[in-house]
């Protein structure tokens, strides 16, 4: 060990003695440039002139380089050169190669891609301009010329004056004096080839491609630059937009050309604004933002596909270039000479001149034919020769590594153009990262790992501690198994109390647990003679807050069996597993006997489906007894305690609360209908409601006197969102409901579990569009779209008692057509339907979504592996009903979305609302609970509200958790009581810094969320991005600049959103704060 420290000290001493010259910079051609204050190249901290240079350099496909002022977007200078792409190969029609139609797609770095019409595949050909030139020379049929050339030109950065040029012929003219302004270097790499007829000298075909690179002489190349604005690109449109950190436009400029490269010079640094980064593209920036909000890995782009006057071209990313180069090197050399046994020279006349220009040339055909032989399209065609195969979806072959390639479908294409006319451009994103497979290390690697642990004292101690722990666990397990009855009788009193508690939380229709079956089997009970009624549970007694009488399901007496059959006598020979299964089936079968009645159906009349999401459906129902309307939430529960405890959490929390600022709870019960009973009841119920709504819609439309063919909305009787929604799944049937996410690969068959925002979008058609369409057209996300409910259970605001099926409709619906045959929404200014029509159609859409219960599927994801199972295969389930106070069919989130002006948000009213929320939180905290998911979507308006006085109520307590007393560090109710809460639950946009860091947290997380909600009430954000960035600043501890617009509220909001929880006020201190008085 001492030798190690001696060597380390010697190395550090050596490094300290080595001189370091920070004033020298080197450029690519090894010319040393000395930094100084006078030459304007590098502005050091010690120089007097320290103004930051901010210039944007753009290169377009027509060969024009433009310099823009980074502060204003005004053009500083412009330099024109030859186009980067030209020639007959780049503007040719499809070529017929042996019966295969190929469309050539050249790349700017001199390679050729092909689009094969037969296989609908885009892939690189194993050929470049260099190999094409070599092949045509070897064939000797044409006179060819071409090659690669590199030209470097130096320009004054500020004036655009050309100082010098260096090419293959010469370099000059030089300047003996040191320039006063920085010099920008523009390097152009050109690959060109021309083929001519040897007799007539007529050009047959040609191709020229070029790339442009920009560097700063004496400057520093940096991958990322720190700037006050962000540059966004619309490459096909030639538009550059500068936005601030709140995504507000600073300036916008059109450079009149298809943009292929952009650089930014800031100070003495230069960095490329890559067109392969989706965050730099105007149309894909929101998708990147969404992936960050959902903690998903950002996809990078391998290729950029664009068109020039309607003809395609490709730009390869540096990664794609390197991968393709290594892959092509592994292919065998094209044996071009051996393919042509009898070369023929082509004659030239007026017709052949035209044909030559259309790439009708035998030499080129031969070269392309040999290249095509090695393509995947050729292999696909060979396999499908025997029969006619259906046309495949478009796919793009991109090299993943030097030895493999990946197929990229249209779902990974992103449009970069806003304009619907002119040329187009698409980013070709990499496929989603695959799950890392287990890999067995080689023996050498394994031995190295073992020795690294042997010589690491910490690792040895950890290994021994783990070994001792495993040994103790094994010994304890053996002792426990050797005397199960002794351990069972040690605490008979505790066991009786546990059994009593278990009785209180089950209904008569629940099947016995595995432990109970195990006890019956071990005690040798005769399952054939055990009466079903002997295994009976006491029903769940709801906590009453009204005089409504509770009822239990009637006990069904089993038929007495007088004769014992042969099957009964053979049960003694059954195995333990068979006895368990038999007992469970017989217990479950009691619910199939005649006489079952639904308490919900007997006591309530459903008026409307007002919400759905996660695992629940919320009905607006009228009590037959007192004729009052309530919000009744129904949740499907699997046959196990863990699932029941999860869904009972909200009911148990609500039962403890009695506060005007919290949704009121009345009572709850459970039902366990026979298999298929609930599905049939839902079908009848929803069909009846739909018929009533259709009749209402017919009457409304009948009264309308004018319609426009171009502005009409599709008839509501065809409006179905069933392809994008399924009945909520059963709680407890997912493998890991806390950590799994779901998706609908086939919406008409698979009903995915949704987040709050996704469910809301589905209600008004936003989710009907396919993923590819949304991403391709890059529709801007609505204000609620960036929110992702990463809840540990599936309660969402859509299940809350006032969630309206149409409450999340945007005020300005965008025009699009549903891909699933749903309602077609048109622009709000042209919509001839009134609000009543819209509302009725939304309700019908929800009903039709719920009506596909029998086709519902459960989609589970664990470690990115999809598992799809039919709902009916998940086992029997019970239904938990929670009766709650009915609120207005709008949330605070809906109000915020509609109230965009400051006039609609008087500060006095906003203060009153914040005070109401603080009062509700104070009550929760005093009761020892933390809400953990406070957001506008979980705040509702009471039906007792008036125009002058709105009463707010906090709802959706599915994530509310009990605290452990004085420290108020949250503890999971369904886990060990010593486990501190660090789980990342709630909505990410409204999480506190300690939640985002997975640290221990207290009730102060609700105060932080309240601060964000207060900010959203006081400040009217112009865009969703502005709100996201503001909240992100709060979560990072930065002070958002937008607070300067509300100086009277600034200190109050900063107190609530303090980075340190101890510095945030309590809910009582917020409610009594002088700012709110």
UniProtKB/Swiss-Prot annotation:
Would I find S-adenosyl-L-methionine among this entry's keywords? no
InterPro entries linked: CC_SR_Kinase, Kinase-like_dom_sf, PQQ_b-propeller_rpt, Prot_kinase_dom, Protein_kinase_ATP_BS, Quinoprotein_ADH-like_sf, Ser/Thr_kinase_AS, WD40/YVTN_repeat-like_dom_sf
User: Lumenal side of the membrane: what ranges?
Assistant: 24-453
The Basic and acidic residues compositionally biased stretches are 766-778
Comp. bias intervals (Acidic residues): 783-796
Q: How does it sit in the bilayer?
A: Single-pass type I membrane protein
The Protein kinase domain extends over 604-1076
Q: What family is reported?
A: Belongs to the protein kinase superfamily. Ser/Thr protein kinase family. GCN2 subfamily.
Its quaternary organisation is: Forms dimers with HSPA5/BIP in resting cells. Oligomerizes in ER-stressed cells.
What name appears for this protein in its UniProt entry? Answer: Eukaryotic translation initiation factor 2-alpha kinase pek-1
**Organism listed in the record:** Caenorhabditis elegans
């Amino acid at each position: 060990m001492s030798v190690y420290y001696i060597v380390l000290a010697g190395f550090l001493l050596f490094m300290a003695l080595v001189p370091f010259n920070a004033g020298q910079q080197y450029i690519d051609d090894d010319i040393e440039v000395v930094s100084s204050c006078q030459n304007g190249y590098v502005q050091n901290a010690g120089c007097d002139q320290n103004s930051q240079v901010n210039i944007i350099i753009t290169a377009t496909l027509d060969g024009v380089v433009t310099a823009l002022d980074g502060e204003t977007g005004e053009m500083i200078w412009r330099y024109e050169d030859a186009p980067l792409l030209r020639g007959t190969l780049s503007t040719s029609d499809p070529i017929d190669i042996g019966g295969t139609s190929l469309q050539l797609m050249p790349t700017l770095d001199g390679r050729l891609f092909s689009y094969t019409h037969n296989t609908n595949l885009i892939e690189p050909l194993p050929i470049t301009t260099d190999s094409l030139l070599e092949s045509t020379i070897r064939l000797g049929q044409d006179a060819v010329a071409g090659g690669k050339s590199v030209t470097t030109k130096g320009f004054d950065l500020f004036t655009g004056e050309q100082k010098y040029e260096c090419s293959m012929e010469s370099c000059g003219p030089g300047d003996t004096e040191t320039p006063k302004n920085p010099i920008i270097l523009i390097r152009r790499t050109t690959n060109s080839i021309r083929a001519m007829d040897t007799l007539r000298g007529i050009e047959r075909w040609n191709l020229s491609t070029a790339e442009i690179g920009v560097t700063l002489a004496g400057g520093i190349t940096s991958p990322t630059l720190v700037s006050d604005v962000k540059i966004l690109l619309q490459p096909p449109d030639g538009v550059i937009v500068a936005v601030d950190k709140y995504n507000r436009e600073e300036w916008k400029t059109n450079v009149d050309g298809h943009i292929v490269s952009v650089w930014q010079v800031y100070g003495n640094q230069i960095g490329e604004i890559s067109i392969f980064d989706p965050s730099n593209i105007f149309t894909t920036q929101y998708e990147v933002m969404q992936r960050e909000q959902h903690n998903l890995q950002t996809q990078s782009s391998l290729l950029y596909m664009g068109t020039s006057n309607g003809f395609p071209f490709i730009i390869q990313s540096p990664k794609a270039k390197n991968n393709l180069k290594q892959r092509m090197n592994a292919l065998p050399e094209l044996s071009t000479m051996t393919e042509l046994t009898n070369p023929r020279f082509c004659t030239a006349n007026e017709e052949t001149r035209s044909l030559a220009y259309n790439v009708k040339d035998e030499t080129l055909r031969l070269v392309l034919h040999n290249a095509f032989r090695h393509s995947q399209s050729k292999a696909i065609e060979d396999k499908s020769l025997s029969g006619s195969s259906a046309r495949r979806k478009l796919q793009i072959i991109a090299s993943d590594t030097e030895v493999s390639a990946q197929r990229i479908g249209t779902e990974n294409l992103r449009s970069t153009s806003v304009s619907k006319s002119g040329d187009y451009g698409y980013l070709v994103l990499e496929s989603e990262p695959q799950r890392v497979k287990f890999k067995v290390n080689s023996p050498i690697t394994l031995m190295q790992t073992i020795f690294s642990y042997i010589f690491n004292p910490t690792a040895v101690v950890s290994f021994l501690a783990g070994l001792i722990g495993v040994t103790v666990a094994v010994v304890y397990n053996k002792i426990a198994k050797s005397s199960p009855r002794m351990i069972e009788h040690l605490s008979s009193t505790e066991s009786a109390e546990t059994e009593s508690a278990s009785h209180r939380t089950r209904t008569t229709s629940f099947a016995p647990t595995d432990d109970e079956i195990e006890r019956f089997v071990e005690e040798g009970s005769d399952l054939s003679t055990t009466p079903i009624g002997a295994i009976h549970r006491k029903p769940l007694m709801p906590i009453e807050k009204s005089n409504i009488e509770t009822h239990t399901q009637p006990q069904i007496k089993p038929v007495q069996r007088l004769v014992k059959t042969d099957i009964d006598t053979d049960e003694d020979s059954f195995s333990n597993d068979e006895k368990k299964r038999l007992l469970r089936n017989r217990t479950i079968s009691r619910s199939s006997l005649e006489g079952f009645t639904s308490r919900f159906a007997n006591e309530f009349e459903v008026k409307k489906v007002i919400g759905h999401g996660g695992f629940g459906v919320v009905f607006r129902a009228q009590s037959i007894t007192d004729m009052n309307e309530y919000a009744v939430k129904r949740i499907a529960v699997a046959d196990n305690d863990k699932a029941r405890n999860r869904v009972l959490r909200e009911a148990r929390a609500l039962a403890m609360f009695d506060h005007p600022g919290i949704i009121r709870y009345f009572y709850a019960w459970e039902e366990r209908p026979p298999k298929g009973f609930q599905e049939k009841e839902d079908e009848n119920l929803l069909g009846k409601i739909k018929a009533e709504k259709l009749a209402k819609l017919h009457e409304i439309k009948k009264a309308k006197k004018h319609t426009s063919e171009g502005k009409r909305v599709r008839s509501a009787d065809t409006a179905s969102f069933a392809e994008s929604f399924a009945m909520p799944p059963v709680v407890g049937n997912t493998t890991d409901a806390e950590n799994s996410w779901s998706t609908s690969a086939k919406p008409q068959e698979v009903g995915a579990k949704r987040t709050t925002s996704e469910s809301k979008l589905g209600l008004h058609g936003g989710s009907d569009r396919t993923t590819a369409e949304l991403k391709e057209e890059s529709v801007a996300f609505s204000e609620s779209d960036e929110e992702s409910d990463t809840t540990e259970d599936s309660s969402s605001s859509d299940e809350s008692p006032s969630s309206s099926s149409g409450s999340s409709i945007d005020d300005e619906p965008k025009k699009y057509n549903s891909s699933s045959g749903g309602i077609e929404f048109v622009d709000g200014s042209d919509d001839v339907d009134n609000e009543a029509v819209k509302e009725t159609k939304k309700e019908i859409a929800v009903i039709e979504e719920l009506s596909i219960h029998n086709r519902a599927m459960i989609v589970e994801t664990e470690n990115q592996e999809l598992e799809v199972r039919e709902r009916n295969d998940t086992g029997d389930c019970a239904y938990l009903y929670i009766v709650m106070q009915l609120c207005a069919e709008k949330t605070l989130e809906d109000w915020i979305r509609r109230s965009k002006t400051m006039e609609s948000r008087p500060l006095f009213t906003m203060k009153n609302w914040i005070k109401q929320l603080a009062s509700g939180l104070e009550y929760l905290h005093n009761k020892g609970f933390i809400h953990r998911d406070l957001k506008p979507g979980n705040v509702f308006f009471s039906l007792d509200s008036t125009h002058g006085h709105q009463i707010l109520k906090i709802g959706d307590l599915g994530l509310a958790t009990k605290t452990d007393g004085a420290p108020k560090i949250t503890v999971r109710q369904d886990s060990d009581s010593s486990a501190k809460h660090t789980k990342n639950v709630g909505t990410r946009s409204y999480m506190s810094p300690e939640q985002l860091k997975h640290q221990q947290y207290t009730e102060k997380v609700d105060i932080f969320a309240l601060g964000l909600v207060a900010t959203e009430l006081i400040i009217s954000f112009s865009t969703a991005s502005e709100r996201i960035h503001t909240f992100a600043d709060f979560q990072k501890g930065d002070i958002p600049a937008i607070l300067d617009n509300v100086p009277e509220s600034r200190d109050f909001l900063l107190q609530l959103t303090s980075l340190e929880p101890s510095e945030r006020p309590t809910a009582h201190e917020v409610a009594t704060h002088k700012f709110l008085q």
